[in-house]
UniProtKB/Swiss-Prot annotation:
Coiled coil ranges: none
Name under which the protein is recorded: Nucleoid-associated protein BBta_7345
Native organism: Bradyrhizobium sp. (strain BTAi1 / ATCC BAA-1182)
Subcellular location: Cytoplasm, Nucleoid
UniProt-listed InterPro entries: YbaB-like_sf (IPR036894), YbaB/EbfC (IPR004401)
Gene Ontology terms, MF aspect: DNA binding
Family designation: Belongs to the YbaB/EbfC family.
Main location: cytoplasm
Keywords (A to Z) from UniProt: Cytoplasm, DNA-binding
UniProt subunit comment: Homodimer.
Keyword DNA-binding included in the entry's annotation: yes
UniProt superkingdom: Bacteria
Function text: Binds to DNA and alters its conformation. May be involved in regulation of gene expression, nucleoid organization and DNA protection.
Annotated GO CC locations: bacterial nucleoid; cytosol
Length: 106
């Protein structure tokens, strides 16, 4: 019975920590860059795009395809950084609770 109560307490702690982490991920921002800094995408760790910066040298009609490719690359870079930030936060939470690595998280 004590083990069950301990597990319930641990589950409640995990739920509380997860809620706090979700709030923190919404405010944590990363920036993906491509083209040597010509294009940057800023997004939250919850994958919400917050801003895009484009160097004026790319704003030429005949450069549209290059710009499109750079935007896709910068977004991918930002997404990878956001996913890494999310994994780091998850590991910090599960480690503090003494849960095994990868405990129920993808």
């Amino acid at each position: 019975m004590a083990d069950f109560l301990g597990m319930m307490k641990q589950a409640a702690q995990l739920q509380s920590k997860m809620q706090a982490m979700q709030e923190e991920l919404g405010s944590l921002e990363v920036e993906g860059i491509s083209g040597g800094g010509l294009v940057a995408v800023r997004m939250t760790a919850k994958m919400e795009v917050k801003g895009i910066k484009i160097d004026p040298s790319l704003l030429k009609p005949d450069e549209a395809e290059i710009l499109e490719d750079l935007l896709v690359t910068a977004h991918g870079d930002a997404r990878r950084k956001a996913e890494a930030a999310m994994q780091e936060k998850m590991q910090a939470i599960t480690g503090k609770l003494g849960l095994p690595p990868g405990f129920g998280f993808g």
